[in-house]
């Protein structure tokens, strides 16, 4: 009988893999390559995550969790919160995670497993984390931020995308939301 994964060890491995992906990206790297980079074996990654695709989803989930953890620290005024969140999300060191997120998302909307399992949590977890804020406004903000990130990842036009993010914050400010 196979041993159940040790959750503390899984957490350590996930943290190490997230750090590795931040430094060198994931692309089409093999499990063996990623495992060697974090000082373990591909068998241990398989034991704790099941497959390369499940590892990719675990990375996306962890990065999303870390980003949701920022919500309580954001300013209370919506326009200021948008600007602060964008300032965080636009950091170049997050780009490998953003590329991975969109890759997994695209594969999921095509129905490919295990990526389709990231829905509907990819939205609902943000709605829950926002608490009492109007869910339609949270969903709108999430959609705009993801659209801006997709534009940034695809074009690398930081100035143009930053201007669009500022325009969105200005719209929210003028609307009095």
Residue ranges of predicted features:
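Hydrophobic alpha-helical connector segments
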Residues: 58, 69-98, 137
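Short, basic, alpha-helical segments at the C-terminal edge of helix-turn-helix-like DNA-binding modules
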Residues: 61-67
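Amphipathic alpha-helical interaction segments
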Residues: 12, 54, 80, 84, ...
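Solvent-exposed, amphipathic alpha-helical segments
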Residues: 12, 16-23, 69-73, 100, ...
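N-terminal intrinsically disordered/low-complexity leader segments
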Residues: 1-8
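Hydrophobic/aromatic-rich alpha-helical bundle segments in the mid-to-C-terminal region
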Residues: 110-121, 130-177
């Amino acid at each position: 009988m196979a041993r159940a994964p040790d959750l503390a060890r899984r957490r350590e491995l996930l943290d190490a893999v997230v750090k590795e992906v931040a430094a060198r990206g994931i692309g089409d790297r093999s499990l063996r390559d990623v495992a060697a980079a974090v000082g373990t074996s591909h068998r241990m990654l398989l034991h704790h995550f099941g497959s390369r695709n499940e590892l990719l989803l675990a990375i996306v989930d962890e990065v999303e969790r870390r980003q949701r953890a920022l919500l309580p620290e954001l300013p209370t005024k919506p326009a200021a919160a948008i600007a602060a969140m964008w300032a965080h999300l636009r950091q170049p060191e997050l780009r490998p995670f953003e590329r991975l997120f969109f890759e997994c998302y695209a594969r999921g909307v095509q129905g490919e497993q295990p990526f389709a399992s990231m829905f509907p949590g990819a939205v609902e977890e943000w709605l829950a984390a926002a608490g009492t804020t109007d869910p339609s406004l949270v969903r709108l903000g999430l959609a705009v931020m993801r659209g801006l990130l997709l534009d940034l990842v695809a074009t690398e036009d930081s100035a143009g995308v930053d201007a669009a993010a500022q325009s969105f914050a200005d719209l929210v400010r003028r609307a009095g939301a």
